């Protein structure tokens, strides 16, 4: 570890408190850094999360962690479990006073100690379900069935006195019905117990506490009306329930009792589930179903939150019904990666903004979980994963719902959203008039064209057409959905709202798509040098490397496109932040994602550069 000691001293951490073959503790002022060396070949998210979680149990909790395997490195802000581009120099004494420290309670420490155990259990349970081939065909099906059983356990904990109301189970308490020890009795009819659990699921899956209420009054339950527990094997039910319920004892207020998942503090359970999804999800690019890499979602949210903090009232403002006005959307939300990250950042922001008033923070954040986070997707399986993911982060009724088409859904209202974070599907000619649905969609995107003239109204849609050589807008027979989503998101944003989206590079560079760029930011006046006539202010473009979405099968080179909807037509285009990410922290070999570490993630330094310049 001598090389690492020399490097950390060079940064300014001159005091070495402890040193071993795989662990060094260094101090600069009052700031602590732990350098941890692992023999693992890859610094996977699970490994990094496990190490950081263990550090959170220490007293004192270190400020930063430098995790390495000798080749790859990960740098972490321990308190916020967040990747940073490098270990910063120690703070000055004045800065130390402002730094602040997060209070770590006994409950927090117990939760952090449980993190690795639960991560191992979740992996084993997923594998058990997948290997059983019990009405599951692939790893994603196994995740879905596991989601249903997690939901059942969450319901049991939160509604212990709930009595079933239908059929032969009427009058039975859910807490007794779902208790794993029922399977351990010698005289137990184990198959009958399984059938009781499956029957109970049909009744409780639409319980009001897990039904989101959309702004148009529509109700959105977690599960489809036809959803049922597919699993039938006794072994699976017993092992899953035991793993979720047998968490040992916990002491609270001087009393020792059996712990439950609800005793886990913060987002520990949600983080466990999120790592499971990212580790086990099978990308199906041909179906347009794949996960946005964690490194991309974190960078996008970090950049947007930096700008939002300049207008703090926007996040905390309440409407006449005392509900948050602030709204975030992902119209192609998948498993909810962007929305989960945004929820975590909003939580931290409110903790700081409302410091000292715990009750107000809890009330405000509860309302934000129900009213500020909106997601839509056309895949029932992805909506299930997103809703369970949100529920495990404490947002049981987040407004995430299934829609046939986010491009045209009436449930998404114009000028409703402050922020949009999204990775829409893209395919040249992907929406075509050859299908009736495609024809209807393209017609929907021509409502702002009158006699060949683009009216460019704030809520108008135009990109179901394109201008000819004389500037007259005419209908097109097909269009890349990514282009239509640019138009749709401009419509859905409030004036001044921010959108960060993944787009294929062709939209930004192809000569044939120039009209899209001009629609977005306007044409350049060669005399004044100003861009005129656009609907948005382009804030930034970050080019992503080819391998970013190679597992999806899309194969297209992509970029992050960041823009603000104009607050008024005369708003001027300023300078545009441009960057190229050569690496995003992983590569793909033989269709497998290989983690390279944070020092191979250009996005961390790019976002840091954006923050310093803006």
Locate predicted features.
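Nucleic-acid nuclease catalytic cores
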Residues: 41-86
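Acidic-basic catalytic patches of nuclease active cores, encompassing PD-(D/E)XK
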Residues: 1-20, 27, 488, 524
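Long recognition/docking surfaces used for binding and targeting
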Residues: 151, 158-281
